Curated annotation (Swiss-Prot):
Pfam families: IPPT. Substrate binds at T15, A16, V17, G18, K19, T20. Belongs to the IPP transferase family. Catalyzes the transfer of a dimethylallyl group onto the adenine at position 37 in tRNAs that read codons beginning with uridine, leading to the formation of N6-(dimethylallyl)adenosine (i(6)A). ATP binds at G13, P14, T15, A16, V17, G18, K19, T20. It comes from the Bacteria. Keywords: ATP-binding, Magnesium, Nucleotide-binding, Transferase, tRNA processing. Its cofactor is Mg(2+). The keyword Transmembrane does not apply. This is tRNA dimethylallyltransferase. Residues 38-41, 163-167 are annotated as: Interaction with substrate tRNA. Its EC number is 2.5.1.75. It is an enzyme of class 2 (transferase).
Length: 312
């Protein structure tokens, strides 16, 4: 597999900020294909709760890394990295532009940077990096990294127990070696971080999205997954699913929906914190201007970037 300096566009941001629509519009105008950078959308049958793009929303644009595995088949960062890089090569071989769109920052960094994986469950270099990260950013930030990898394990370990959190990350990453943020990307990548300065505006959009999920049949989707035997899988610990399971067991729906909204808002806040620390990109404020105006900014910067890459 080639890791030459292939141009890649990356669109990240918190949930409900407009990544999907932005990516599709960009792909339509620039002959691109989408690679999903989401750790839940890789699972089959988990559509509504993961806000997976629908066939209608795709508008004919090919999407990669959706519906890859069943909910009882765990997706590791290493496996995702391999699949995503293969997709980039395949898209580029067709003369098209790879566009990565998603909110799982760790997965996206693993695609772009020289993360190495070994079969070891313990890795001294990784452990030292994680301990330094905890000292610099705090125990909560470290715990958030574990949550991105293994939400269930994160629930079992107190954030202040740094040693256990570090060890859990080591195990979850199967010896992944971290790189510093100053390392160059393996690709000629242009990265956009979509966000909203007005948190209440973003939170309102999140609440509306959750209400729409309920209308679209989220409870029935979770019911089907539980009936299929997936109740206790790691995938079902994802936000959007774990909150609904108690409803199937007799708990009232309204408090569960409110809990889902709260959890999603907290997750969006953690995503933004992570992006600030881990990504040096173009931050696009999506709340003040119209979508069309914001898209023009993104499109113009992308065209300029591609021209510059071509002239090198």
């Amino acid at each position: 597999m080639s890791l030459s300096k292939q141009p890649v566009i990356v669109i990240v941001g918190p949930t409900a900020v407009g990544k999907t629509k932005t990516g599709i519009e960009l792909a339509k105008k620039l002959n691109g294909e989408i690679i999903s950078g989401d750790s839940v959308q890789v699972y089959k049958q988990m559509d509504i709760g993961s806000a997976k793009v629908t066939q209608e929303e795709m508008e004919g644009i090919p999407h990669h890394l959706l519906d890859l595995v069943d909910p009882d088949d765990e997706m590791s960062v290493a496996r995702f990295q391999t699949l995503a890089r293969t997709a980039i090569d395949e898209i580029a071989a067709k003369g098209k532009l790879p566009i990565i769109v998603g909110g799982t920052g760790l997965y996206i960094r693993a695609i772009l940077y020289d993360y190495q994986f070994t079969v070891q469950a313990e890795n001294k270099v990784l452990r030292e990096e994680l301990e330094q990260f905890a000292q610099a950013e705090g125990a909560t930030a470290l715990h958030d990294r574990l949550r991105q990898l293994d939400a269930k394990r994160a629930d079992e370990i107190h954030p202040n127990n740094i040693q256990r959190v570090v060890r859990a990350i080591e195990v979850a990453m199967s010896g992944q070696t971290q790189v510093s943020g100053s390392e160059p990307s393996l690709y000629d990548s242009l990265l956009f971080v979509l966000h909203m300065e007005d948190r209440e505006q973003l939170y309102d959009r999140i609440d509306q999205r959750v209400d729409l999920m309920i209308e679209q049949g989220l409870v029935a989707e979770v019911d089907r997954l539980v009936a299929a035997g997936y109740r206790d899988t790691k995938a079902m610990q994802a936000i959007g699913y774990k909150e609904i399971v108690p409803v199937l067991e007799g708990a009232p729906l309204e408090p569960a929906v409110e809990q889902l909204k709260r959890n999603t808002r907290r997750f969006a806040k953690r995503q933004l914190t992570w992006f600030r620390h881990q990504f040096d990109g173009n931050w696009i404020e999506m709340g003040r201007l119209s979508f069309e105006e914001n898209f023009k900014i993104i499109y113009d910067r992308t065209v300029g970037f591609l021209k510059a890459v071509k002239s090198e």
